[in-house]
Amino acid sequence: MTTLLNPYFGEFGGMYVPQILMPALRQLEEAFVSAQKDPEFQAQFNDLLKNYAGRPTALTKCQNITAGTNTTLYLKREDLLHGGAHKTNQVLGQALLAKRMGKTEIIAETGAGQHGVASALASALLGLKCRIYMGAKDVERQSPNVFRMRLMGAEVIPVHSGSATLKDACNEALRDWSGSYETAHYMLGTAAGPHPYPTIVREFQRMIGEETKAQILEREGRLPDAVIACVGGGSNAIGMFADFINETNVGLIGVEPGGHGIETGEHGAPLKHGRVGIYFGMKAPMMQTEDGQIEESYSISAGLDFPSVGPQHAYLNSTGRADYVSITDDEALEAFKTLCLHEGIIPALESSHALAHALKMMRENPEKEQLLVVNLSGRGDKDIFTVHDILKARGEI
């Protein structure tokens, strides 16, 4: 099928979906391309970002955790966005696209529940019906977000197949869309999946990096040495990276979930520890068994518990433009506690992975003068019960 935009990032990406979904993807691409050129659409999107979601978000300089080092550390505060995470940015854009295409329903998948909450709020705001697929395990560990979705009128459908987590929710959402695309828009929650989703999600998240660039220049008079973001599917990271890709002096660091440790096999780090394959409509690195079956990923944070990664991250990794590292559950938990105790900010466990790597960079080289920005992609209200149970089991509380 000919496309208006390039469906690949190097060898990664593409449109590996059943033939029945090709017209829906073509319609979506056409709507997106025309919307990008439509000043009225852009004005409506920007108005929602400013007056509903609360953009621009703050860039906060850490006051205490850098003590004794020469690091200056800023946090891009996506946790302050309405809905509690960066997810709100792109769902507002996709919901407007759905209306533009004449759709009346939204289908979504969610892991941590943040994309589900964002999909529910955008649907409520714009008068769209919303059904959300969520792994049964995630329904259990993210009950506050499940209730938020239901409060805003969304139907939450627990998925019991497979590992009962995000990858299974993705499969069910795609299955639903195959039979309902004439009236429903599939609101994919990350910068992954079949073309044109990785491009759409990047463009509807790129204000994160654009704002960061303007804010850091105003505050410090120069660009950062590195921007750091956690990577599950990769939307918050690509939103932060997009405006810095051509700034070759700025390091781009993506942080995958190391789970219980890479050597245990219980992690979610396919970029560095997976093999390229076809999954979820795209060609990308993924965690798979010797015979090509998708392996279960694992992370303390439901939002990073995904066995593959967006194709643009795969490309940035293959060209060496971005570096990808991993952080274990324990390291993320320590960073979570550190930010709570010393800066009075409760971060999402997802974002705590990025913070943990920044703290590691700082502590490994305390003499080095460096200017770092961490994308604090979401707030940790949804994670307090998980953290409470772990700390209680350890006898720390």
Swiss-Prot record:
* Statement: the UniProt record of this protein carries the keyword Membrane: no
- Provide the family line: Belongs to the TrpB family.
This protein's GO cellular component annotations are: cytoplasm
Copy the pathway line from the protein's UniProt record.
Amino-acid biosynthesis; L-tryptophan biosynthesis; L-tryptophan from chorismate: step 5/5
The keyword Lyase is assigned to this record: yes
Q: Name the gene behind this protein.
A: trpB
Q: What class of enzyme is it?
A: lyase
Instruction: State the name under which the record lists this protein.
Output: Tryptophan synthase beta chain
Q: NCBIfam families of this UniProt entry? A: trpB
Task of the protein = The beta subunit is responsible for the synthesis of L-tryptophan from indole and L-serine.
Instruction: State one molecular function term (GO).
Output: tryptophan synthase activity
The UniProt catalytic activity note for this protein reads: (1S,2R)-1-C-(indol-3-yl)glycerol 3-phosphate + L-serine = D-glyceraldehyde 3-phosphate + L-tryptophan + H2O
Q: What is its EC number?
A: 4.2.1.20
Q: Give the stretches traversing the membrane.
A: none
Q: How does it assemble?
A: Tetramer of two alpha and two beta chains.
**Keyword annotations of the record:** Amino-acid biosynthesis, Aromatic amino acid biosynthesis, Lyase, Pyridoxal phosphate, Tryptophan biosynthesis
Q: List, alphabetically, the PROSITE patterns matched.
A: TRP_SYNTHASE_BETA (PS00168)
Residue numbers carrying N6-(pyridoxal phosphate)lysine: K87
Q: Which InterPro entries match?
A: Trp_synth_b_CS, Trp_synth_beta, Trp_synth_beta/beta-like, TrpB-like_PALP, TrpB-like_PALP_sf
Required co-factor? Answer: pyridoxal 5'-phosphate
